[in-house]
Amino acid sequence: MNGHSDEESVRNSSGESSQSDDDSGSASGSGSGSSSGSSSDGSSSQSGSSDSDSGSESGSQSESESDTSRENKVQAKPPKVDGAEFWKSSPSILAVQRSAILKKQQQQQQQQQHQASSNSGSEEDSSSSEDSDDSSSEVKRKKHKDEDWQMSGSGSPSQSGSDSESEEEREKSSCDETESDYEPKNKVKSRKPQNRSKSKNGKKILGQKKRQIDSSEEDDDEEDYDNDKRSSRRQATVNVSYKEDEEMKTDSDDLLEVCGEDVPQPEEEEFETIERFMDCRIGRKGATGATTTIYAVEADGDPNAGFEKNKEPGEIQYLIKWKGWSHIHNTWETEETLKQQNVRGMKKLDNYKKKDQETKRWLKNASPEDVEYYNCQQELTDDLHKQYQIVERIIAHSNQKSAAGYPDYYCKWQGLPYSECSWEDGALISKKFQACIDEYFSRNQSKTTPFKDCKVLKQRPRFVALKKQPSYIGGHEGLELRDYQLNGLNWLAHSWCKGNSCILADEMGLGKTIQTISFLNYLFHEHQLYGPFLLVVPLSTLTSWQREIQTWASQMNAVVYLGDINSRNMIRTHEWTHHQTKRLKFNILLTTYEILLKDKAFLGGLNWAFIGVDEAHRLKNDDSLLYKTLIDFKSNHRLLITGTPLQNSLKELWSLLHFIMPEKFSSWEDFEEEHGKGREYGYASLHKELEPFLLRRVKKDVEKSLPAKVEQILRMEMSALQKQYYKWILTRNYKALSKGSKGSTSGFLNIMMELKKCCNHCYLIKPPDNNEFYNKQEALQHLIRSSGKLILLDKLLIRLRERGNRVLIFSQMVRMLDILAEYLKYRQFPFQRLDGSIKGELRKQALDHFNAEGSEDFCFLLSTRAGGLGINLASADTVVIFDSDWNPQNDLQAQARAHRIGQKKQVNIYRLVTKGSVEEDILERAKKKMVLDHLVIQRMDTTGKTVLHTGSAPSSSTPFNKEELSAILKFGAEELFKEPEGEEQEPQEMDIDEILKRAETHENEPGPLTVGDELLSQFKVANFSNMDEDDIELEPERNSKNWEEIIPEDQRRRLEEEERQKELEEIYMLPRMRNCAKQISFNGSEGRRSRSRRYSGSDSDSISEGKRPKKRGRPRTIPRENIKGFSDAEIRRFIKSYKKFGGPLERLDAIARDAELVDKSETDLRRLGELVHNGCIKALKDSSSGTERTGGRLGKVKGPTFRISGVQVNAKLVISHEEELIPLHKSIPSDPEERKQYTIPCHTKAAHFDIDWGKEDDSNLLIGIYEYGYGSWEMIKMDPDLSLTHKILPDDPDKKPQAKQLQTRADYLIKLLSRDLAKKEALSGAGSSKRRKARAKKNKAMKSIKVKEEIKSDSSPLPSEKSDEDDDKLSESKSDGRERSKKSSVSDAPVHITASGEPVPISEESEELDQKTFSICKERMRPVKAALKQLDRPEKGLSEREQLEHTRQCLIKIGDHITECLKEYTNPEQIKQWRKNLWIFVSKFTEFDARKLHKLYKHAIKKRQESQQNSDQNSNLNPHVIRNPDVERLKENTNHDDSSRDSYSSDRHLTQYHDHHKDRHQGDSYKKSDSRKRPYSSFSNGKDHRDWDHYKQDSRYYSDREKHRKLDDHRSRDHRSNLEGSLKDRSHSDHRSHSDHRLHSDHRSSSEYTHHKSSRDYRYHSDWQMDHRASSSGPRSPLDQRSPYGSRSPFEHSVEHKSTPEHTWSSRKT
């Protein structure tokens, strides 16, 4: 304790306590890299240990403070200490703290020589503008590139790191190979917490905030500068609105920001952060703090030992896991001590208390069984938490030793991923885990690492058989291989020497894992082949593989490549290569299928000496993407490990053979021709060909000591309730069943699944209500009586429990496992459970608990499909298969979990089958699948050609076709319906011994049997003997009956009557149901009307209707038959990935990888992809043709949707994603080699990131998006070929680019590609488009004449008739447009359907600005800040007219300023973009959007110009002699950009259309418009001036604008303000000036529009005629005709022109 003041002084100089700022988000990134001695407050992790907020700390420190801290450091004189003795004599946490202090002081001594270095870096001025920040920081970054790459993308160095950081970085290049591991600056750090018991008031010394001085002053100064820069940038990026209470007040935004380093920032005190509460107890008062850590308890004893709460006062204490510290530093704390220390995260305490109280309340009322179950779960969890305190392996160490003489170690903890690694104090780790340290240094110094020049890779040696087990196999424990395993090892070695890759296909339980590891060990020791060996295994067996490698081949370095992106990056940093030699560190890499596919590019880049695939039957489909990915890996030898090499067809066997030996088994057609069915002696030749490549042994042949396995099939009848439900399901689905072979497969399968559920238990069909039973006994009885199987199982388990047997119970259905678990709890039978939801360590705990010596667990509930192979439950001697699987192989695997090596008792297998049900028939048919397995693999027969089918498996889930399914469904149904409704008989009571005696029994006798007996014995289900033979003979007769004969007519009539009643109810209750449907729509359900429609029109509808009691049962899935083989979750994943790629139907392999659907065949994926695409197109078309609801705002419209199976798809969203990524898909080469050379063809603007970012990085980012999908930033980061690993997603969240910045950059780059593509296509198509244009003229001209005649002849309809006529004409126009556009465009454009039915391009961007653009706009609009503020807030007391005039003046002032701002640009694209940005900025100050404001401004400016130029227009009646300067300027503007003009009329690609329309505002007029290109002098007076070309161009202008005029028109009238009307010209006599078409140079390039309307759509507007009448100029002056009609809203025109004869045309949306 007396060293406390010393500690404080050291803390003052080191800034060490700053680690508690982890929760600020900088934990992983801003810590320094390699401080071996930074544990001044008792910490043990010193290299990336300190973790401070980089901005607040450095910005707050002045130069004088830095100098003071340096002086303090100079004064510290460390004593000499023997570190090892020091630890032995003082093993408490205080001693650890002191050792760290001494170590720190020694480091300070070494740094004195560097103190005089230059301070110029820190004096550098840090500008507040973002540009100067970036440019200067880039210079700094270049100086320190070496440090940057070591940080793994974590950003700039942090000032809170250790003193030895820079020195260590300099030493990196010179340190030897064993010390080449450097500490990361971006990972979770863990240190021993400070001695919290010493902190009385929780206040930390402010001096702790002083930053440490690195050995290099330049580094220190750079840190200062970087952090100041970040600080000022954070200030600059605040989104400040101009809306203030005092309009003209000078606010903070008007002031320039000063340099960050001149602005002192308040110091923040930093405290520890609670990560989670692990446990709670009542403990002795004061038994809290650092003395309660596990190492302090081991050293000094437990302060809580011997506490009895009844005899002495106690207090509630909580076990705390501290953020940034490993579990080894967990401490017990009270609420009081936590408050004293001012820790962060106290809200978690309240949550923990609330949860704890709820648990205690539940336990108080729970039954003893529930309490016991809860306690067991807690015990498992506690065991798991204890593992978190055990070091699994050390992966790095610091290069500098502490005062105690130990380096710090980077530790990976058991049961936790690599991302949870932490730096720990060397003295502590060496005391507790010295073995891990020895292994670590042994691995680092090992000479047995892989090297490319190993000669046996090029020339295989001669095979020498192993007569006895070599000494190197068996590990330290001296384990022995069995004889057949040694033979297997010899066979594997022989195959390798011969150059044959092979398949190890031993039956489950024979030790394929051990044989494989022994083979790798053989290569390692006999042939000095040190790897790299890749083992791809399922997740469920990965820990088993890891354990066996450690046991049998401990000399080999095996790395488990698993976890999230951070974990895998950690492995690649520390476990992959030696930093000096770049040679691989590991011999064996263990990974899973999923991780292999995620990191395909990285792992596929290595040359593997060996690839082994466990559970290789996942490769049986050669069309799956998993298969295609793995087969491309470079390997010298391949081994497939599978217990079931053949499941359904010979094609699957060929797929495996093709994978291992693609040259030898190259063609399936040749293989089928040689060994296919009908070929005499075909199988003999096949056996001979397979011999060198496939080894298959079964237990009874090789393991004579394995006890017998006896199977009994127990048949039982259904309970009365089951019979009722069974008949009810069949009756309800009568319509679907009666279709027979014309029905849908999915429909039959759904019925089948419902019947299988019914056979298992009634609760699967209709669960009971919560309060249905009064007591536990009644609930138990009802549970048992609801299933015939459970009645029998109950008797069986009671008998087995008496005998002392231990039981495995398998079911396919997880909900059935729930019911069985409930039953076992009622019976108080202790059990474990394993299904798909129980993962990783919990699964391992359950297995170990069951297999433990003296375990009291009686049952183990397992899902048939869960767990994979390799799970050993040999301590059980009884297997109950509650329901048989479609695939008999799964049941065999289930049995083998008990009947395997190590089993000492006879294994009894009881298969429960419901008599007279679909189950019985399924079982009979499924056994035929086993015959194939025997004929080919077991080599038992060579004449079974009639049985073998060589085609592909019909389905992975069910092997039956429609005819078989229909026959199975009829099985037993007739007998069932013979019992009258409501009089179903309960099954007869029978003694369990009698049942077992009568059951058919099959034993696997060791002697050879006949072929048929052997087949059935292997399958364990013999043909149904004795009492059931009659049933099988009756099957053909039963199958011939129709469902009308099976289901009684009265029951069918009753069902029809119920349906009629339901329909009538729906008709009468329609309004209420419509409301109801709205209320529940958020659940994704549908109204009952749609349900009844589907019920009558679809096969599978009727199925789902018939099985929905109490909203249970399978969901309604209408088109499920179209997507066979995909679950809803898989479809969701597919659609999510589908949206990430352009041209998704050409990128199915990438989609499958991203969606983790690599097991699916490309054919299935293509089918699903086409279903999605076509469904979206259809939904959009249906939506555009149907009437949408009016009213409501655009932003709220979700767009058309449709359903695929149970998944709702937003058609608009999917198509928009697809279209937006098309430019990327077209630009990036599909060939991988060409893709590597790709460079973006456009000039790109600078990216203001915190790292150097150039054109090459932009190109790599686009390549990454192409390969991995839009948004897959982590995958892009991990691809070494893209060189973005250290550039994107830095670990410091304050550093850019993070995901948000990458998305913005990607959008910008794709937009550039779109424009570039559009230009190229425009140039390439210019010639042909001119020819087409000439033909189009004539048609459009003819149409114009027709329209003119119609206008003349039409009389004005009554106002009341107007809307109907308008609608008719509108619909006619729209339909014409749709028909023509199909012909003129490459493909249909994706559209958003507005309420009025007019399509608007789907790719219109939302009006949002990124932060940087917003800031620029803000600065540019600062001169009109007052006008912006007043825009929406006119003075009080003004009349309506005055208010409107006020608003108009503000708008004119703002608009004129924008026009001035745009003059600095010459590029039309830039002008368009910045006009858009500035108007969007203006829109933030008013309720109008940017388009509306721009349009209103143009109206206002037009009015101003008209009033000024009215006299000029009257004096110049002839338009051809006008010399208005505006018109002259217009002609100049329109006389250039020929390529743009040519492309105007050409057939352009869809994407260009989208690109332009995304960016433009609705009200914009068009720059360099082609319609204004013709010289006015070409017109003659009178009607002759209207030549066809003139109309063609003008009408295109108007018809194209038609699409975009709809946005404003469909809004409700109250949405418009009077502002719009007042700002427009209401007088028809006003003359339009020539400058109307050119408002402030606001013209779009002629390439803006690419879609052409048909000639029927080109109608001139009545405005032209009205202007002609009102004007004193010549008849139909071209200038008058060319007024921008688009500037008037349709609403205004309908009001203005009602009195005119042609007002019908005025209302047409143009």
UniProtKB/Swiss-Prot annotation:
Residues 1-252, 1080-1120, 1321-1408, 1502-1710 are annotated as: Disordered. InterPro entries: CDH1_2_SANT_HL1, CHD1-2/Hrp3_HTH, CHD1-like_C, Chromo-like_dom_sf, Chromo/chromo_shadow_dom, Chromo_domain, Chromodomain_CS, Helicase_ATP-bd. Residues 122-136, 215-226 have a biased composition (Acidic residues). Changing residue 618 to Q: In PILBOS; patient cells show a global increase of methylated histone binding. Its main location: nucleus. The modification Phosphoserine is found at residues 215-216, 241, 252, 471, 1025, 1040, 1081, 1085, 1096, 1098, 1100, 1102, 1161, 1353, 1355-1356, 1360, 1363, 1371, 1373, 1622, 1677, 1689. Residues 187-210, 1108-1117, 1329-1345 have a biased composition (Basic residues). Coiled coil: none annotated. A motif (DEAH box) lies at residues 614-617. Residues 493-663 form the Helicase ATP-binding domain. ATP binds at residues 506-513. It comes from the Eukaryota. Sequence repeats lie at residues 1628-1632, 1634-1638, 1640-1644. It is found in: Nucleus; Cytoplasm. One of its GO terms (molecular function) is helicase activity. Component of the SAGA complex. Interacts with BCLAF1, NCoR, SRP20 and SAFB. Specifically interacts with methylated H3K4me2 and H3K4me3. Interacts with the FACT complex, the PAF complex and the U2 snRNP. Interacts directly with PAF1, SFA3A1, SFA3A2, SFA3A3, SNF2 and SSRP1. PANTHER family: CHROMODOMAIN-HELICASE-DNA-BINDING PROTEIN 1, CHROMODOMAIN-HELICASE-DNA-BINDING PROTEIN 3-RELATED-RELATED. Belongs to the SNF2/RAD54 helicase family. The 2 chromodomains are involved in the binding to the histone H3 methyllysine at position 4 (H3K4me3). The CHD1 helical C-terminal domain (CHCT) binds DNA and nucleosomes. This is Chromodomain-helicase-DNA-binding protein 1. The gene is CHD1.
